[in-house]
Amino acid sequence: MLSRRGVMAGAAALAAGAAGLGLGGCTREVKAVAGFIGRMTAIQQRLGGRLGVYALTGNGDHTASGSLSIQSTERFAHCSTFKWLLATRVLQMADQGQVRLDKAIAYGKADLLDYAPVTKANAVRGHMTLSELCAAAVTLSDNTAANLLLAQVGGPAGLTQFARGLGDSETRFDRAEPDLNSNQANDPRDTTTPAAMAWLLKTVYTGTVLKPDSLAQLKAWMVGCQTGLKEIRAGVPAGWTVADKTGRGNGAVNDVAVVWPKDKTGKEQAPVFLAIYTTGGTLGDDDRNQIIADTTRLVFDSIGFVETLGQSASVSAE
């Protein structure tokens, strides 16, 4: 559960870190954090279930990062949020010469799942390229595309190994679509933590996992994601760049993103890596989407990310 003690300890740490760096406005930031707990508690009460959040900033230097966390080490079903990482692995394999993105992957009617808008539309062709499948999996969350890609990366076990190689000891992949969306209580299969997913985003976007052109392609796919227009994207000001991947299934509604804020002059700032996972409760889809949008707004409004985080400060409501 959310803890006032945890948030206030985070506020003190935030103020101390800002003071140590000679930053002004510490009192303002502490007051902002002090109000955070009530607003977040209200959001979780509206949800009627469990909410996990991890937000991280910084340009790859672990000593120059700020974070906000709410139940960020608890496990949640990742559902389709994993598809951005699946596309990352395919791009890495292409960078390493193991595959070509224009390689045609054959499939038939037996491979088509209920939710497969792009692969169904291309079924007459009988194949799609790896690049086309990645685009389908990320931008429209096509489940058949994801399964065809999983087969190319060594299945769930191969994708788990990839995550381990990126330093993630938490995220695991056990099944293919649609079974991975079962979201059963106390079932560790096909789960992640908000902290693990946010760090994966940061590792990929600020590291050397992908060559520059491949990273640009991943960003383009995620910026083009059409399934999350009412979630994280709805919680940030118009004009900010958002690259995200959503996921939902059996009471879980999730969104993970890289967000590039803009200052008052319109200049793009350092990215924020954000993972929001929810499960449980009885809200409908529209209300669940609003929970994620409101949580996103709270992340950026209450803490003052652009000015403060990224200065080795952290705020935790664990």
Predicted segments, located by residue:
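Conserved catalytic neighborhood of penicillin-recognizing serine enzymes
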Residues: 112-148, 156
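Short, conserved catalytic-motif segment at the N-terminal edge
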Residues: 48-76
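Short, glycine/proline-biased beta-turn/loop segments that scaffold the active-site neighborhood
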Residues: 96-122
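Active-site SXXK
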Residues: 77-105, 274
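Structured C-terminal helix/loop/strand segments within mature extracytoplasmic catalytic/sensor domains
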Residues: 2-12, 27-40, 47, 74, ...
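Extracytoplasmic
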Residues: 48-50, 71-73, 81, 100-102, ...
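Soluble periplasmic/extracytoplasmic beta-strand elements of cell-envelope proteins
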Residues: 52-56, 85, 106, 148, ...
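Mid-domain, small-residue-enriched loop/turn segments at the edges of structured enzyme/sensor domains
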Residues: 50-51, 147-206
